[in-house]
Amino acid sequence: MPMTNQISRDELRGAIADKLSAHFGVTAENATDEQVFQAAAIVIREILSRLHTFDSRTAPEREVHYLSMEFLMGRSLMKDAFNLGIGDALTGALEDLGRSAADIFETEPDAGLGNGGLGRLAACYMDSLATEGIPATGYSLCYELGIFKQKIVDGQQVELPDDWLNLGDAWLMPKPQEAEEVHFGGKVRTRWDNGHLMVVHEDYTRVLAIPCDMLVAGYNTDHVNTLRLWDAKSPKPIDMQLFSQGQYLKANEERAMADSISTILYPEDNHYEGKSLRLKQQYFFVSATLQSITRQHIQTYGTLTNFHEKNVIQINDT
């Protein structure tokens, strides 16, 4: 049984009220449903974070690294509370705050990280790995707008941006100190140095991969795994020289290019630009992930000689 079973309804009610005050400057009486949802999500996220920190004190014998372009995670508040054994306590706490728990759960948007069967399969694997107590990290992109929201106007489908992060970012823990750098374009040359062949990459465009971690709770266990989502950012927010010359749009080109990588899940690819963007997404995602896995392994063991013994890498593809 998870330790979280010891968390009472009263403790959750007090914690949610504290988050409403600290993060939004409101009381439960005048908070919106959206604010109550975010406060509750932060409380559950902090519980997961404590469990994950406790669980990560020792290096695992072997860790699974699961790469997928999409994870159809759905909504997390009710699911995580249920998995932690505090679903009834959370429902009661919300009602004690004068809210309908069903309304608060309904307020949460689906995480805009997946679309179909491939994403649902990936999410099921993450849930199962956590439930079985298998150390695992999932990797994907932190899509800003998901795929799209569908609206029917005059009998026709209209696609609208899915701004899920407006509320969904309550689950994310950005870790800029663990950012990786991905290089696009440029040229490669080789040279010999003291009998060793050196490969040099030059004149490339740099894009930062900022990890935003989402914690995944297993059912009826204290084991928690991580879904690491990469957010693409330019290391140079703006070209000040071009901006000073009045070339405002061109001054933002580098930032716009970087941002586009993690904006939309499955951008339209019936034209060259769309195909190019999809390729950039996949290259960016894989490069950042492998750099992260390698860096963390070296930090833990100081060598790559045992890499194959400590890591299993699986790509979710069809």
Language model features: what each stretch is:
Residues M1-T318:
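A conserved ligand/cofactor-binding region detector
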